[in-house]
Amino acid sequence: MPVAMPVAMPSAPPLLIRHATLPDGRTGMDLLAEGGRFTAVGPALPAPAGTEVIDAQGWLLSPPFVDAHFHMDATLSHGLPRVNVSGTLLEGIALWAELKPLLTEEAIAERALQYCDWAVARGLLAIRSHVDVCDERLLAVRALLEVKRRVAPYLDLQLVAFPQDGVLRAPGALKNLKRALDLGVDVVGGIPHFERTMQDGADSVKLLCELAAERGLRVDMHCDESDDPLSRHIETLALHTQRLGLQGRVTGSHLTSMHSMDNYYVSKLMPLIREAGVHAVANPLINITLQGRHDSYPKRRGMTRVPELLAAGVNVGFGHDCVMDPWYPLGSGCMLEVAAMGLHVAQMTSLQGQRQCFDAVTVNNARILGLEGYGLTPGCRADAVLLQARSPEEAVRLRAQRLLVVRSGSVVSRMAPAVAELRLPGRPAHVDFTRQAAPPSIETAR
């Protein structure tokens, strides 16, 4: 694939965003960005000479959205070479195997770049993408490494070496995974529940955690993406995380078998996950779609135990996982849609639960990726998204418009407000779907 030079972001003058509401509830706040960082936050800040000033008009200014689990090598490939008729995880894997021989670096890169455009417009400025290494050519690896380089000025792309067909099960997978890491892939991935036996799955976890420890890398494994309550590789992942001193650097993604596990066993498992400092990622849109496909009724929701993990002290993030690919025909890079689905599936409709779901696509995911300088305090990177909402809860409810997206102090995307014009006698001329009355506080709400 021809190598294109990345286009650097132009040097930006100071940027002052006035009259913003922050996720912690503070209103009338100004944020000054200089040299790609926030240098001051507070009310009525003075504007240095030459500053671009933007009036937030009281709308919610948030750190950008972060996606902790995605498959960019497959994104926007829906219908190639056919569609997933059953809608199951296994047919999706089989369909991906049919598609892989037909892929080119150029096609993978072009689809990925288009998706990154969507992401920026959605205020999604950091993505962790798994990339399949079970291909001797490593086409997807090479394509996404090039995409990572090209989008670096405006989006942080973190890549996981993912042995889709099993690192022990697929011939050459371990060698290819190491090659991918040598080329510059950031994170060690795995899929223990897809190995031939439970023992092979456990062995793969040990092997891959040791590899990550040797190389000083993070770990993110597809773990127990199954309806089988006996799929318990997360406990092995937590064990080796502690043994190797990888606390805070390891993520268990999906963990859907926990939905079906015995409650007593889970009561022992959750403290182990917390003590090991293992992050958990649920993928609400995909878990509710793929899990429980073979159930009659009642059908399992399939998503892992999000509120219980949070209550146990585990850092939980949400991922989009798929957009228009062999596993999922829908999606558009909207992390607020992900948060809203997670809220519904986990029945987290309290004000606290709604806020936790917003955090699961922002600050929690930033911790999972280990993002430096994430936030809205002085010294943080001047990355932010202005949402047409007055609170995080309202942003989730409305899947709020991204009025403004800022990267390193430069505006990289603008979107018109969502406003409907009404022609009703005696009623307002416009509605934007925000509630005008003050909402109840968390303390007084039921």
Where are these regions (language model features)?
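Active-site gating loops and adjacent loop-to-helix segments of metal-dependent hydrolytic enzymes
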Residues: 76-108, 184-187, 208, 233-251, ...
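Divalent metal-coordination and catalytic microenvironments
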Residues: 20, 36, 58, 69, ...
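Histidine/acidic residue-rich metal-binding segments in metalloenzymes
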Residues: 139-153, 170-279, 295-318, 374
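Active-site microenvironment of metallo-dependent hydrolases
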Residues: 1-39, 44, 355-446
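Alpha-helical scaffold segments that flank or form the walls of functional sites
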Residues: 78-130, 138-150, 175-182
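Active-site mouth loops of central-metabolism enzymes
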Residues: 95-110, 160-171, 192-199
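His/Asp/Glu-enriched, well-ordered alpha-helical/loop segment
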Residues: 218, 239-250, 286-290, 300-387
